[in-house]
């Protein structure tokens, strides 16, 4: 496991031994559940990235409106190859490319080929820090390749002073202190609230409390979506150096 400590939080990613359009994956059925546990599972993906270490880096993410996969930037920064797969037990991995990245907020968007991951159902992105202390919802974490829905509770809204993902500049990152136990490989998991709303992205475990984590809010996602609109999803972008 690789860890980086900054601003009182512990960023952890797992190192594993190596062994978008309306007619694409975002086409929603006429009736869908709005329960957070159900909608989180229907949008979740397991992410594997290679190229920065001898072993894979593992993370999580979720499909959002616009057929983009939302995740944490430090999971995919510098990667030569990225694959994603849905939470379905029989799902196969497909290639993904980074189309937008924000190293300050620790957020990234991925795209896959049109027609892939058609089983996913997108989440709506909430603007800004819409959650409040006591709010609850669900995230999907992957354990030994299996998707597990885990409830969360927001402890409070926070602005964390932390280094960017490349440890070059201190930034103020708005988001949430979240009551949830996470482990290596959970970075990028998307917090899902009622009515299919994505409200945050987990990026770090608390150093002080095992059952506490930190998440960026989704206030910067609209800007990432706008940036991605100018990118060829078949090519992607340069994601910078490994972290």
Regions found by a protein language model. Give the residues of each.
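Bacterial N-terminal signal peptides that target proteins for export
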Residues: 1-9
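A conserved glycine-rich beta-strand in the N-terminal activation segment of trypsin-fold
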Residues: 28-33, 44-66, 72, 92-95, ...
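Short Gly/Pro-enriched turn/cap motifs at secondary-structure boundaries
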Residues: 35, 98-100, 179-182
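Active-site region of chymotrypsin-like
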Residues: 39-50, 113-121, 148-242
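Conserved active-site neighborhood of the chymotrypsin/trypsin-like protease fold
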Residues: 67-149
């Amino acid at each position: 496991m690789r860890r980086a400590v900054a601003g009182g939080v512990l960023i952890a990613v797992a190192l594993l031994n190596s062994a978008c359009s309306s007619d694409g994956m975002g086409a929603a059925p006429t009736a869908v559940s709005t329960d957070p546990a159900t909608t989180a599972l229907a949008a979740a993906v397991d992410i594997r990235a290679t190229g920065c270490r001898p072993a894979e880096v593992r993370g999580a993410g979720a499909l959002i409106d616009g057929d983009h996969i939302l995740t944490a930037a430090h999971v995919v920064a510098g990667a030569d190859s990225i694959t994603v797969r849905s939470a379905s037990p029989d799902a196969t991995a497909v290639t993904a490319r980074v189309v937008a990245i924000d190293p300050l907020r620790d957020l990234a968007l991925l795209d896959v080929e049109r027609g892939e991951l058609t089983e996913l159902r997108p989440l709506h992105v909430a603007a800004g820090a819409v959650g409040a202390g006591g709010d609850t919802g669900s995230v999907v974490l992957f354990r030994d390749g299996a998707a597990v829905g885990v409830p969360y509770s927001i402890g409070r809204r926070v602005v964390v002073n932390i280094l960017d993902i490349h440890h070059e500049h201190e930034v103020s990152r708005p988001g949430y202190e979240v009551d949830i136990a996470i482990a290596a490989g959970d970075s990028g998991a998307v917090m899902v609230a009622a009515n299919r709303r994505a409200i945050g992205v987990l990026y770090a475990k608390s150093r002080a409390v095992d059952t506490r984590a930190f998440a960026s809010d989704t206030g910067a996602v609209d800007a990432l979506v706008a940036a991605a609109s100018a990118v060829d999803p078949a090519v992607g972008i340069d994601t910078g150096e490994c972290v």
